[in-house]
Amino acid sequence: MLEDMDDDSIHLVVTDPPYGLDGLDSDWKKGTGGKRGTGAVGGLPIGMKFDPNQGRQLQKFLDPINAHLFRVLKPGGFMLMFSAPRLVHRMTVSAEDAGFEIRDQYAWRFTKRAQFKAFSMDHFIRQQADMKERDKQDMIKYMNGRKTPQLRPQYEAIMCAQKPRTGTFLNNWLEHETGLIDAKQTLTGRAPSTVMTVEKPDKAKYNGHLTVKPVRLIEHLICLFSSQGQIVLDPFLGSGTTCVAARKAKRRSIGIDINRNYIQIAKRRIEEETT
């Protein structure tokens, strides 16, 4: 669908692409991946070990998509893309290579108590079959509670990129009505911030979709970076949050997803939550 869209036809892109491509294996290509439990590494399926090549594969995957998103966005239009913190740099490089200007990085902070996913060395020491029990206890005491380097996750990164403007901020707005923010939009009653605190939604409500985002957060972003009546695009629609939020914000929207089940969920949500 992206290939068929007109140049300079979209005002805003808000999207949450899949992070763990090789963890989704061939099922992702068939449109059946993504409904698995989460493991110790946020955003990646259980049993999948993160390695540096993961980011390179994500960047390779996003490069042609970002090229199309750059093409279809109006000059001055923004692209807001969610990412796992350890992958956001690859996502950013891909957007920059496509021609975008990187404006900022935001944090979606969630207050719900997340699982502390660090592993204690005690367990691994106890599994050492060639060690005497006394030696194990001595080593456990020596390690003094050391764990693997995973802190309790409390945020997701949001990359903010912008297609270069035509002329000045004012001239670009007068021609395309893009490139500026509506600073009246606020989550807290204060000026909009780079840290946005919104509670996580219930995954079970959306057929167990792993990375569903809060409608309130997406609606805030849409209102901040676009105007009523404009077109918002999400090329990784998932359970439909972007389209629901866009309709609530009185914007038009285009949602794309390879998973037919999620398309049906999105259609139902749009009908149930916006009428």
Which role fits each region the language model picked out?
Residues M1-T275:
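Core catalytic lobe of class I
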